[in-house]
């Protein structure tokens, strides 16, 4: 099967979800692939949907097998809050209310607004021009 050959746990999970035939699992798999295309901020939704898929499937895997794949069981309240946060963040991302800047600052984890980034960039350009004079 293709899921055993793949080393990436996220891809392995998606392949197992789509291949299981469960309609809820297929829906979760499609949502996860949509989420990964949008490159959301964290992998919490992936782990939480893996937990939901495991609880809803007809042949549930043991918690030790899931822990070996990186899925951890925690407080159900925290799990549901993580799912709600991820869905809310995805909704904001789709509506364009959350914008991600593609800059060196974003790569280091510092989130700057576009205006602040541009003003900082303009200040650096002015300093370079003044240094040349």
UniProtKB/Swiss-Prot annotation:
GO cellular component, one term: membrane
Keywords linked to the UniProt accession: Membrane, Transmembrane, Transmembrane helix
Cell compartment(s), UniProt: Membrane
Membrane association type: Multi-pass membrane protein
Segments traversing the membrane: 13-33, 73-93
Note, other: Partially overlaps COA1.
Protein name stated in the entry: Putative uncharacterized membrane protein YIL156W-A
